[in-house]
Amino acid sequence: MKNSILKYFPNITDTQISQFELMGKLYPEWNEKINVISRKDIDNLYINHILHSLSIAKFLTPIDNTTFLDMGTGGGFPGIPLATMFPNCQFHLIELHT
């Protein structure tokens, strides 16, 4: 995981690395309980979900305290990875289905 994210985002902090690594532990655990993402895709969490969510971060430089709204967040993508990438911004994740 660490290398796949650092390949595209070499300047992320140790805290962010730890948070992304924690996602790799929490998502499979919770996916067993509530099917957060497709069970077939859980082995590709970093490539298909986390890095995919972060793709916009290569082109986005938000000002601190910018507020983002992730409508239809589903399993928390792209909101959770982007909130990790931009910790000085506010993210609101909304999902209609529970």
Sequence positions of predicted segments:
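Class I SAM-dependent transferase core
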Residues: 1-63
